[in-house]
Amino acid sequence: MNADIIAFIEGGVSIVVSSRSEALEPSVARGSGCRVDAERQRLRIFCSRRAAAQVIADLSRGAPIAVTFSRPTTHRSLQLKAPRAALSTLEPDDWSALERCCDAFALDVAQHGHSAQFVKTVLGLDAEDAIGIELWPDEAFEQTPGRHAGDHLPVR
């Protein structure tokens, strides 16, 4: 992933994680933040186990994953896809990344009148409920509304 994509997805964005069942029924969960590894290959999304239970079940069966990132104030959006994902516990660096993501998102949505407390209530995770969803994206798409929506973006 290039520096622009990384800066965007690790910034103040809304994150939606999606997958599907064996019957092709969609599953969706909100991500609370993300972190890209030093090699720019792997992405870890931070989620609530309870809220993402169906997504986790689908991913555990080997279903593909799509993650959409969108900045509320500008509607800039992009989507990353991978044929499968792995589940993990959050590492110490993940917690600081989660805090940075939530703080940046709070600054963005404050322009729409939402408080930092609102963001912490919606996106906050506790250690027992938190889970990491790891993916190695092989496709990226521009999803910002307009003439370039759906365009492929370079992943590597």
Regions found by a protein language model. Give the residues of each.
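Short beta-strand segments
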Residues: 10-48, 78-79
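Short, structured beta-strand-loop surface elements
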Residues: 51-101
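Extreme N-terminal tail/first-helix region
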Residues: 1-11
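Generic beta-strand structural signal
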Residues: 13-15, 63-67, 76-80, 129-133, ...
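A structural micro-motif recognizing beta-strand termini
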Residues: 48-50, 138
